[in-house]
Swiss-Prot record:
This is FAD-dependent monooxygenase CTB5. It is an enzyme of class 1 (oxidoreductase). Keywords: FAD, Flavoprotein, Oxidoreductase. It comes from the Eukaryota. Residues 78-255 form the FAD-binding PCMH-type domain. It comes from Cercospora beticola (Sugarbeet leaf spot fungus). Its EC number is 1.-.-.-. The gene is CTB5.
């Protein structure tokens, strides 16, 4: 396609659509309109304005542009300067935008690059934005809401999980979503995030019943177990490589309030936590109602503390202080500051727990995530803590500096996913796993340290992986939603899984628009 002229591009689009057998109906008039907008324009943003209308495209001098750029979770994405931002309000708007930008890329070679922003939570630079290109900000996309029988809920990709929970909690229902409020549905579902309920039900992506997707041709299609099932499967973990998800339909399940909260401890108690964590994470069988994160935090003026997240998701009735967590509850608790509680344990709903967890996150800052996995091992948890502490000491005086180490168990019952249909493929971990969600944040004034911190984190993780391999406890797995830009989740999937994903990409995006024109996120390997 890159060698074709515009008239050839336009004339070939119906053929392209027909290549995607059974995907949807192609409407030539829509492409004629997009072509007319491109032909009469001087730039990609000009063409987009003609296609969508001037009220749906904003520029650097507009307040709505500043609001969009300032609302990313990580200020690293605010470093970029898109030429314009499109604010679609329907799947049809997204369709027009994609058709226009696909055609525009051939009139203005090397231009019309675009990013797609749902919730805007992925922290690395360029994940959902682009410099001198276009951002499609899905913030204004509508949500259909809960079904009459409460069995499903359909929401836009920019809807945050706590708003989903709020609707479902009112009906004693829930779904798989992130543990932290404020994160968008789109990225967490296409990246297969983890939930309080993951030991029972698997990954967030495995709860998706239907995707509404805009393909590179501009066609709006449904992908589910019956329609375009290969696309449905690919999007369950395939991230942004196949199209733009404009609506997500999630299955729900019965779930009432449950027991949980946070407990706070002195860093000196960490060895006790590590031993309890190893026992919990190694359990066979694993208690599927047990959710636990051991969190070590450097913050608050320069000291470490521990803030654990404990939930036991059994409800009707809820079970307070269940047997599985009694060893954890014996460890002495210490308020972070005098006058603060030593724990927040109570019976509550998932909306409340997710918002409590989010309240511990400072906005806005520059953030970096990363992930490492190993077999449950208390000694290695201490080793990694010491390595992390040593690696980051040179940065602890940066304004707003915070380091968070989240040790999370991933039992085989979660990793195996009960035969779920998704694009994670077989996860060969030789048993239960502990993975670390690494998060570093600091103030905007310290942006000059971005590259140095990234290099230090890479060196740390390479050394830690080497040590884990030496000890025989390395596990070839990372949680996709916790990966940094240098940790492609696709490097951890089987060859057959990658081949299947690439074949699906070429089927639904034969001109590879989402591989070449959308640089953000994690791209599929070239095979």
């Amino acid at each position: 396609m890159l060698g074709l002229n515009l008239q050839q591009v336009l004339s070939n689009v119906p053929t392209i659509s027909s290549i995607v057998s059974g995907v949807g109906s192609y409407q030539h008039g829509s492409d004629s309109s997009a072509w007319a907008s491109v032909a009469a324009s001087k730039s990609c943003c000009d063409a987009l304005t003609k296609s969508l209308g001037k009220n749906s495209v904003v520029f650097p001098y507009d307040a709505a542009y500043s609001q969009s750029m300032g609302s990313y979770f990580s200020l690293k994405n605010s470093d970029l300067h898109p030429s314009c931002i499109a604010l679609p309000r329907s799947a049809e708007d997204v369709s027009k935008a994609v058709r226009t930008l696909s055609l525009g890329a051939h009139k203005w070679e090397g231009q019309c690059q675009f990013g797609v922003r749902g919730g805007g939570h992925t922290p690395f630079k360029g994940a959902a934005s682009t410099d001198n290109g276009i951002v499609l900000d899905l913030l204004h996309m509508p949500s259909a809401g809960i079904s009459p029988d409460y069995e499903t809920i359909t929401v836009s990709p920019s809807t945050t999980w706590d708003l989903v929970y709020e609707v479902l909690d009112a009906h004693n229902r829930s779904t798989l979503g992130t543990k932290v409020a404020g994160i968008g549905v789109g990225g967490a579902s296409t990246s297969c995030g983890v939930s309080y309920f993951s030991p029972r039900y698997g990954y967030i992506c495995d709860m998706v019943e239907n995707w509404e997707v805009v393909l590179a041709t501009g066609d709006i299609v449904n992908a589910n177990a019956n329609e375009n099932p290969d696309l449905w499967k690919a999007l369950r973990g395939g991230i942004n490589n196949f199209g733009i998800v404009t609506a997500v339909t999630l299955k729900t399940f019965g779930q009432g309030p449950f027991w949980g909260g946070q407990t706070f401890h002195s860093i000196d108690t960490r060895q006790e936590h590590f031993k309890n964590h190893e026992k919990l994470a190694s359990a066979h069988p694993y208690d599927p109602y047990a959710h636990y994160i051991n969190t070590l935090v450097w913050a608050n003026g320069g000291h470490w503390f521990i803030g654990n997240s404990i939930q036991y998701t059994k409800s009707d009735p809820p079970v307070a202080e269940p047997e599985v967590f009694k060893p954890f509850l014996k460890t002495e608790r210490t308020p972070i500051f005098p006058g603060l509680p030593e724990d927040t344990l109570r019976v509550d709903n998932v909306t409340s727990f997710s918002r409590e967890y989010a309240a511990n996150t400072l906005y806005p800052q520059r953030w970096q995530f990363a992930c490492i996995s190993f077999a449950p091992d208390a000694d290695f948890m201490e080793t990694f803590f010491q390595m992390a502490n040593d690696a980051m000491q040179q940065y602890v005086k940066l304004a707003g500096f915070k380091l968070i180490l989240n040790y999370q168990p991933a039992p085989t019952v979660q990793l195996e996913r009960n035969g779920a249909v998704d694009s994670l493929g077989p996860i060969q971990t030789e048993g239960n796993v502990v993975f670390v969600h690494w998060a570093v944040s600091y103030d905007e004034s310290e942006a000059q340290f971005d590259d140095a911190i990234t290099k230090s984190v890479q060196d740390l993780f390479h050394a830690a992986n080497a040590k884990a391999k030496e000890l025989g406890i390395y596990r070839h797995f990372i949680q996709p939603t916790y990966a940094d830009s240098w940790q492609s989740p696709f490097d951890y999937r089987s060859k057959s899984t990658i081949e299947e994903l690439v074949a699906t990409s070429k089927k639904y995006d034969p001109l590879q628009v989402f591989q070449k024109q959308v640089p953000g996120g994690f791209k599929l390997p070239q095979i």
